[in-house]
């Protein structure tokens, strides 16, 4: 009989000090969000540290505005030839 009262007493204390369901749900949600953000930060750091293997390494050549640079090529060649 004493063990039954002890278990009931402990259950009563646990229910008295237990948080509400919404508080527990909010805390779990915050912890999960925190872990996700930490994982994303780690992955971002790893991607920034690692050299990305580009499938088209000469892509930057296409980005050069050749029409604007072509008129200056003879000037550069002449300047290099004088040295």
Swiss-Prot record:
What does the entry state regarding organ or tissue expression?
Expressed in entodermal epithelium along the body column.
Q: Where in the cell is it found?
A: Secreted; Target cell membrane
Q: In which domain of life is the source organism classified?
A: Eukaryota
GO cellular-component term (any): extracellular region
Primary residence? secreted
Q: What does this protein do?
A: Antimicrobial peptide with a broad-spectrum antimicrobial activity. Keeps its antibacterial activity under a wide range of salt concentrations that mimic physiological conditions of human blood, which is surprising, since Hydra is an obligate freshwater animal with nearly no salt tolerance. Does not affect red blood cells.
Q: What is this protein called?
A: Arminin 4364
Species of the source? Hydra vulgaris
Task: Give the classification, highest ranks.
Answer: Eukaryota, Metazoa, Cnidaria, Hydrozoa, Hydroidolina
